[in-house]
Design a protein with these regions (language model features):
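Bacterial N-terminal signal peptides
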Residues: 8-17
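Flexible glycine-rich, low-complexity coil/linker segments exposed to the extracellular/periplasmic environment
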Residues: 225, 245, 265-269, 276-281, ...
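Loop-centered beta-sheet repeat module
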Residues: 269-326
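Bacterial N-terminal signal peptides that target proteins for export
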Residues: 1-8
Length: 527
């Protein structure tokens, strides 16, 4: 009994301990489970937060991509608008011409001539404003300048070499700004074409059907200087509507104007049995005015008034007046005027121009020139240098008391129907063949042939009267208005027994060559 009681007590105590231990273990487990559940909940919440962040980032990225797309589209649209506006505001164009010439003169070989290439730009900064430019490359292929400076042989050596092609010229034919106040009143300033006659303001090669410019405007010229002739200045132009009477067109400018300017020529010559020669020729002749500091105080004026009763019909008069002597010579002026016109009757056209230029008091200018220059020439005498001669010479050129002349050109436009289906017609809307005849005459009265002076005194002034005429006949093919293929025969004649070289600036005639025959084949194009 006692043992049973003892066993019962022991079991009771053990069971109590086990129960206590089991109770403690369940509490721990419950607490651990709660902790785990809490961690799981926190992880869920963290995942939800991360998912939300990811969704927000994806939304932000999508919004950013959309914004980038919108900005790119906006930039493309802006670029398109700028390109479109630029294309509307700025137009690049130009014209060029090439000629082949066969000539009867002894010293002129058959030759191709790159007449010129002219680059044009026409811009509109705003609706009523315009900027226009023509940059000419005449007979130009290259221009290279080399210069070295270094110590040598106990001193300083400077060497310069210039390489270029004969007759090359780079020139601004036009560069002006225009403000259209009204159709009848437009302000223009810059390098403007002088409106004397019709050719100078319509000189583009691809407008004409003969591959040579006229004697009046270029080959002599009768104009104070050869065309194209721009001057720096300002003025007004415009169109005045006259209702049923057509319209008046005018131009009027104040410009620097023509002036006698120096052209310096270096000549190196070997001679036998005479001494070898190095010559410096300084030739003063009428030249277009400067774009820097004018050589004279007074300015020139030029104006043209044209009446056009119908399209294709025009008659005009123009005038030029201005001092042509620099400030260091006596004050003398040029007076020039021109009459020109165009008439169209069906396929026939007649276009003409007459120009008269008067250089006042050429003899007085020669005396004034002699006083300033003092001696016409100076050289090293043979007693000092028996094998080598160096000479400096001054002379007047291109002056005549009066120059006047005209050209008249008749044209007949036609197109044979059988050519329409050929390569000459099927690619073009309105191809044309044009038969052309041009007649020209020039008179030079009081042309300065020679002026000699010494010690500041004019000792000899030799002047003469000369005449020159030319007839040209040809055929032109125009597939489009901007392109022309030209073929012409040209006959030029001056006073019997006198040289054509004395009265033209393009024919290298010998002293006894008073006439020349030429075949001209040319292409002129615009774009």
């Amino acid at each position: 009994m006692k043992r049973l009681l003892t066993l019962f007590v022991v079991l009771s105590v053990g069971l109590t301990a086990v129960g206590t231990a089991l109770g403690a273990t369940l509490d721990d487990l419950e607490r651990q489970l709660q902790a785990i559940q809490k961690q799981i909940q926190e992880l869920k919440e963290e995942k939800q937060r991360q998912d939300q962040k990811i969704r927000e980032m994806e939304a932000a990225q999508a919004a950013q991509k959309e914004e980038v797309k919108k900005e790119a589209a906006s930039l493309r649209e802006q670029a398109r608008r700028v390109s479109s506006e630029l294309a509307e505001r700025v137009r690049i164009g130009g014209y060029g011409s090439v000629r082949f010439e066969g000539n009867s003169l002894k010293e002129q070989s058959n030759t191709f001539t790159f007449r010129r290439f002219v680059l044009t730009a026409d811009a509109k900064p705003a609706d009523p404003m315009q900027v226009y430019m023509e940059l000419e490359f005449e007979r130009f292929t290259q221009l290279e300048l080399e210069r070295t400076t270094r110590p040598q042989d106990g001193g300083l050596r400077v060497a310069q070499a210039i390489e270029g092609t004969d007759g090359s010229e780079i020139s601004f034919e036009q560069l002006w700004f225009q403000y259209d106040l009204y159709p009848w009143l437009k302000f223009r300033t810059g390098q403007v074409l002088v409106p004397l006659g019709r050719f100078n303001i319509n000189h583009d090669d691809n407008r004409w059907n003969i591959a040579r410019r006229s004697l009046v405007d270029r080959g002599v010229p009768v104009l104070p200087v050869k065309s194209a002739w721009p001057e720096l200045g300002a003025g007004f132009l415009g169109d005045i509507r006259l209702g049923e009477l057509g319209k008046l067109t005018y131009e009027a400018y104040v410009i620097n104007g023509v002036a006698l300017d120096a052209e310096v020529e270096n000549i190196a010559q070997t001679r036998d049995p005479r001494r070898d020669k190095l010559e410096l020729e300084v030739e003063f002749q009428p030249s277009r005015g400067t774009a820097k500091l004018d050589m004279k105080d007074s300015k020139a004026v030029a104006t043209r008034l044209a009446w056009s009763p119908y399209p294709g019909q025009e008659i005009a008069g123009s005038f030029y007046y201005g001092r042509y002597t620099p400030q260091f010579l006596s004050d003398e002026s040029i007076v020039a005027f021109a009459i020109d016109g165009l008439t169209t009757i069906g396929p026939f056209e007649i276009e003409a121009e007459y120009v008269n230029t008067h250089f006042r008091n050429v003899d007085r200018v020669a005396r004034s020139f002699a006083r300033v220059v003092v001696d016409q020439s100076a050289n090293i005498p043979s007693s000092v240098s028996p094998t080598f001669e160096a000479e400096v010479e001054f002379e007047l050129a291109g002056l005549a008391r009066n120059k006047h002349g005209y050209w008249i050109e008749g044209r007949y436009r036609f197109w044979p129907e059988f050519l329409t289906s050929t390569v000459f017609g099927k690619y073009f809307e309105n191809p044309q063949l044009i038969a052309i005849v041009r007649g020209e005459q020039v008179w030079l009265n009081g042309l300065v042939r020679e002026a000699e002076f010494e010690g500041g005194v004019l000792t000899k002034l030799e002047q003469e009267n000369r005449r020159l005429y030319r007839v040209t006949a040809g055929l032109a093919y125009r597939p489009t208005p901007l392109v022309v293929f030209q073929l012409a025969y040209e006959y030029t004649k001056t006073d019997k027994g006198r040289s054509l070289a004395e009265v033209t600036n393009f024919l290298p005639a010998q002293s006894d060559e008073d006439e020349a025959h030429a075949i001209l084949v040319g292409v002129a194009f615009g774009f």
